[in-house]
């Protein structure tokens, strides 16, 4: 819940000086990206900008305090301020900020700018007291904000010092409007107008000018001169002499003498007590000060000119001038030290009654009241956890003694979830074990089950599925139905474990249950996770169309609940890319993989490994080996600079081994094979993939017998567990083994099985990646004209993809190849005596690749009649009469030159 006063522009008071010369300068602010108003405290920054902002409807105001260094809090208020300015135009950004569903401030701001692109009128955001921001992450995000904000957007920043916002760069590019302390200082004319408004009897212009010079035009000093003259009935000049040369750091003594000592005891105590509040309203004042009518008292203090300012148009919320408020809080610690804890307790109680638990925690911490802090956490901690107030919760839990946590074990559970959210897995188990050992008496069974649910999540995250399954089952056996969050966690973990064990149907059922529970209780990140898992399971079962439809539901959930910034969004677009790749929709697959990288742009580069692997796959399927090599260099660099889950490594190794196969790099394959781990099992698609990598490397090295043993065992497991997509992949690799080892009949048999299974999976690229060996077999099958209709159609589609992407098949017949061929000792005499032209060599390569006459004409951009002439000439030179004879002749030439066809 946001405090309204932090989003309210200060109210302009009737007696406030209107700074016409400065307002004239600010009137051109819409021509700049940033309007920066800087000066020490008390120079009238806020007053000036509030005057300028008066009458501007499309302006948001955000007043900072020390608590705004928390990124999530800063984001929530900033977006809320822009929502006020735009009348709710940026609803997606608002929802993401409220639910903490963004990867970083930068990514949230990027979404904000997408929405603001549809806002075409001038728009302003004022951020007051920016000097309170010390968090470098926020500084970095605001630099990003300034670089990318729309042209019709002006950011107005008020600060006591020069903020870390790339000011020099903006200044050089003339995108910065600056007002500093020298300009904010009152000149002689303004000082005269000021005193004429504040003093009962006018003073001479020369006297006014002298006083202005004495205090260097400092607005706070001028205000104190007028206040002192009214309270003490002394001359203004006397006060001016006392303030001459003084600055904010030496003001305390003066304020004691001239302000606090000149009000009655009741007012003095009111000022000191109320100063502990960063913002205040009637209810807070009544509780903190004991005054019966807080609103009336605030208005009275305001009339006395005691540096109190209204924070909203309704006059409900007030705050002290920062300089005066800081002074009062310091004096309160000295004068009311004994009462201070009780004052903070009263403030905490009032904030709780008004529904602001985070503000209440601030005062409970200041009071040092562990019992009050504990009670607030017991009632509100999980709500704060779900809104990602993690830093505040961590600070609060550290302030509680361990004994208090043991007496309230749910707070121990909260602390453990905090650790889990920060990936401190070993600390989670240590904390829970210690708590179980030291909790007095018999531990509540439900709480123990909640501990086990969390432990199960930690175990699966840490790569220990057996322990995760044991703990998840224990938790589900003991958890009441009402304990929905822990039941969702345990059900999800159990489903994930079964997925790892290859029990796909039962895993799918549990993930569907998880989705239903998570949707019912609005636990959206688990709902999304369960959909992603369902899609992976359906893909493994070979039901790729069902996987696609599940992904569509997941994308819809992301859109409805504004989950675009969650890292899980990358997981979803990645598995969508895998599916698109399988169906040979390579451009879409690449775009999806790149969008996954964009989601992770604010994370460590190592997180992008999986999407980078997919980019390599796309290049390999296109036959673009140069691009694949470039991407592999980056991938291998990431592999060497991080620790990864085994399935991440398996996917990365897959594209490396395929690249070595396509380039004939046996040395790299042999080196990898010596060092790569060999899993004990192959009962899920992760482990099947790693064993398939091993078999592919063995085939490349000519180790056909061990590769066949591996693949036969993989197929047995895949059939047993219904891992149909893996079976399809295994059959294709087995086909390559048989083909290369000369077992043509076996190769044809398993290829037919693979084509039949592809009717279910829809696989295309898995065939294409095998290149020319696959193309040659498919040509033979098509020529036999015995394939069923669906398999015939798929074979033709695969062949077209190979012909389109794998240009190296006829690139062999380039000038360099032809020159080497003609110099080969075994070249047929007919070719040596009647050499083909370069164009005829190109035509032969395209015939060999399965192109029709029309396709060859299109490829070479010549007329079909010209192609017929080229074909007639090359047939005559080769001594062949039919197209199939030409194909066989080309194949013999390639074999002679050492190409494995």
UniProtKB/Swiss-Prot annotation:
GO terms for biological process: positive regulation of carbohydrate metabolic process; positive regulation of DNA-templated transcription. Residues 829-894 form the HTH luxR-type domain. Residues 853-872 bind DNA. Activated by ATP and maltotriose, which are both required for DNA binding. Keywords: Activator, ATP-binding, Carbohydrate metabolism, DNA-binding, Nucleotide-binding, Transcription, Transcription regulation. It comes from the Bacteria. GO terms for molecular function: ATP binding; DNA binding; DNA-binding transcription factor activity. ATP binds at residues 39-46. Monomer in solution. Oligomerizes to an active state in the presence of the positive effectors ATP and maltotriose. Positively regulates the transcription of the maltose regulon whose gene products are responsible for uptake and catabolism of malto-oligosaccharides. Specifically binds to the promoter region of its target genes, recognizing a short DNA motif called the MalT box. Belongs to the MalT family. This is HTH-type transcriptional regulator MalT. It comes from Salmonella gallinarum (strain 287/91 / NCTC 13346).
